[in-house]
Amino acid sequence: MIETAAADILAGGMVPLEMTQTQIFEAVQSDTLLASSLWINIALAGLSILLFVYMGRNVEDPRAQLIFVATLMVPLVSISSYTGLVSGLTVSFLEMPAGHALAGQEVLTPWGRYLTWALSTPMILIAVGLLAGSNTTKLFTAVVADIGMCVTGLAAALTTSSYLLRWVWYAISCAFFVVVLYILLAEWAEDAEIAGTADIFNTLKVLTVVLWLGYPIFWALGAEGLAVLDVAITSWAYSGMDIVAKYLFAFLLLRWVVNNERTVADVASGLGSGSRGGAAPADD
């Protein structure tokens, strides 16, 4: 039976060098804990898409609409990416390099998560930056640093030639993350005060920073790093953070935008813009 063979593969930690997509799919599905961490996100992403479309049906202000579009892209990207993961399309078994706790073993690597993050987290930052009344330069810097963080994180996960190089890529990714944190905690926090959106911004800022800090921590503890946690546990940690950092975050943001559309419009017209030094609002 393929299911039994897949279960033996995961249990033993050793797999053939060339697994077909069907074999990877069976391996993922045979691990109930791992598979459930993916299916739950597909279900919640689908429900979130329907809910957010309904919430935004009467929004008329262009800036508020742009926030809605950026936020709606988050579950749209997630449902696509998690479908890729659950199908085995964006999952590989990679042999860990010498020095790794699982050196020589083929470890399931759901690298498709990095595609999710590279496409969805910039949308989160765009939505938050627009809410804060940020200018184009800060938005661009945050988004580029965020994409750099995700791409170098992917490089860390896929590097099999050297265990040290995996951690070098990890350190570079964390450096990009520091740039994102600085903009969120310093630049945009001040902009939001000027824009009159500080209350909701501070809530979203804390939610984002606390949860996003969890990703590099679980990477380091998971099979890709120190291998203290197995693949299924790490997958649930990522999925749990995704649920709160994406869907709950998006709901809180969009609910506030719907109830405070006039405030958002004032930011767009420059009445509360946090763009200091005469810089234009991000959507001008």
Curated annotation (Swiss-Prot):
UniProt modified residues of type N6-(retinylidene)lysine: K246
Pfam families for this protein: Bac_rhodopsin (PF01036)
Record PROSITE patterns: BACTERIAL_OPSIN_1 (PS00950), BACTERIAL_OPSIN_RET (PS00327)
PANTHER family hit by this protein: BACTERIORHODOPSIN _OPSIN, NOPA (EUROFUNG), PTHR28286
UniProt function note: Light-driven chloride pump.
UniProt-annotated location(s): Cell membrane
Family: Belongs to the archaeal/bacterial/fungal opsin family.
GO molecular function: monoatomic ion channel activity; photoreceptor activity
Annotated Gene3D superfamilies: Rhodopsin 7-helix transmembrane proteins (1.20.1070.10)
UniProt keyword Magnesium present: no
CC per GO annotation: plasma membrane
BP terms from Gene Ontology: phototransduction
Record topology, Cytoplasmic segments: 57-62, 133-135, 186-197, 260-284
Main location: membrane
Keywords, ordered alphabetically: Cell membrane, Chloride, Chromophore, Ion transport, Membrane, Photoreceptor protein, Receptor, Retinal protein, Sensory transduction, Transmembrane, Transmembrane helix, Transport
SUPFAM superfamilies per UniProt: Family A G protein-coupled receptor-like
Membrane topology: Multi-pass membrane protein
Protein name: Halorhodopsin
